[in-house]
């Protein structure tokens, strides 16, 4: 899970 991709 890469939440940094959701910007």
From Swiss-Prot:
Tell me which domain of life the UniProt entry assigns to the organism this sequence originates from. Answer: Eukaryota
**What name appears for this protein in its UniProt entry?**
Unknown protein 20
Q: Which organism is it from?
A: Pseudotsuga menziesii (Douglas-fir)
